A protein has these predicted regions:
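Vicinal oxygen chelate
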Residues: 1-8, 11-20, 49-51, 69-141, ...
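Short beta-strand/turn micro-motifs at beta-sheet edges
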Residues: 2-4, 66-71
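Structural motif
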Residues: 4-7, 30, 73
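Core segments of cupin and vicinal oxygen chelate
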Residues: 18-63
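Short beta->alpha connector loops
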Residues: 41, 63, 88, 110-112
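A generic structural signal for short beta-strands and their flanking turns/coil linkers
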Residues: 44, 54-55, 77-79, 100
Length: 141
């Protein structure tokens, strides 16, 4: 990038996925994955804090088609996102998911380092728990 007036993008601040049953999604992300709810509008969205720097936005896909305060948006089919966890906690997460009857879809050990566990949320979105090393980036992920 050659424009000195524009700084480098530093982070993904929000990630959005879509689900029709927001009550079920709220229970899953709050009670199973331990995320804190930071915003809710019944029938439209539920938002979760992820770590110190990002937010997971879950929208009812029908409620965002026409726009409003935000531009219209949406997606068809399941989405995917990854949540970072410490390497030493991956076995505990595997057991926690099993104890909560969450089917593990796939496990991967990555060539650069890091490992991932994939599973689905109640809306069918692919959720990945990943340990540092996956991308070999300075931040560790």
């Amino acid at each position: 990038m050659n424009n000195a007036a524009v700084s480098l993008i530093e982070a993904v601040v929000e990630t959005a996925v879509y689900a029709e049953d927001l009550d079920q999604i709220e229970r899953f992300y709050r009670d199973v994955l331990g995320l804190n709810v930071i915003g809710r509008e019944p029938g439209r969205h539920v938002f979760f804090q992820v770590g110190n720097h990002s937010v997971l936005l879950v929208f009812n896909p029908q409620a965002t088609l026409s726009g409003g305060v935000f531009p219209a948006h949406g997606a068809r089919g399941p989405g995917h996102f990854a949540l970072g966890v410490r390497s030493e906690s991956l076995n505990n997460w595997r057991q926690w998911l099993t104890d909560n009857r969450i089917a593990i879809e796939k496990e991967v050990s990555w060539p650069r380092g890091g490992a991932s566990i994939y599973f689905r949320d109640p809306a069918g979105n692919s959720v990945e728990l990943v340990t540092p090393g996956l991308w070999g980036t300075p931040a560790g992920w």
